[in-house]
């Protein structure tokens, strides 16, 4: 995909909201349009957005830089991680993006934050280090080669914070990998707090790749834990799976005011992607509620835009060069 200078400027103006009139969900659409370019222009424009005040947007900026997977993005991501005044949700995403880009030079920097005051930042750095180290193993190198194969049809195109467990790394799961016995084993590994987080994440993404209702139930059991990072990743996985079977637990998470904003935000966006009729009332409720945390309210706004896209028949969500959408009615 190649864009003219005029088109790039239009996307930049949308993402950075230079007019002050661009709705958040339109900024996100423009951002994901840039992400799809996977080039230096996209990195340059996305990197400018960290001056914004919106934590949700900056978290999405960091995510997109990681998914572009270009070391040119590392300086800005390192700067975000090092900034103690930045929202922890943004710093965590910067660390995760460094893991996605996966250069050995990032390991010493990530190690500096293994004792960060914020738990989600500490845990993300732990997982990112383990991922970079795994990527350098024989299994990791083989998987990297497979993921870069243009002829491959992956189950998911995302660069995940941890690979699925062996046997469920790529391609459709074999029958022996989706048995109830295997799901129970993965569930046990997912919930075992004595295991390294990286290994628990591997079980999480293996269950995602299985994708059955039983696998969804196993993943949902992870919402009972005390790690906001872990629970937010489960909600993210549900947003990839798009299984209506996950809707009840995601609504419960969104409605749970004592839950971390980071977890509720991810639950909201997952609901928007699933886009069944029953997700609309809670999303509209939390857009309108005066007591909704900013990140939760904004995530519901983005989720409603996702819902409208999924139910519109439009071909492409990342259509940031089209006319801005109208405000979402609540």
Curated annotation (Swiss-Prot):
Family matches, as SMART domains: EZ_HEAT
Pfam families membership: HEAT_2
Residues annotated as binding Fe cation 1: 59-60, 92-93
UniProt GO MF annotations: deoxyhypusine monooxygenase activity; metal ion binding
Cofactor: record remark: Binds 2 Fe(2+) ions per subunit.
Residues engaged in binding Fe cation 2: 232-233, 265-266
Ranges occupied by HEAT-like PBS-type repeats: 57-83, 90-116, 199-225, 263-289
Pathway it works in: Protein modification; eIF5A hypusination
Annotated protein name in UniProt: Deoxyhypusine hydroxylase
Source organism of the structure: Lentinula edodes
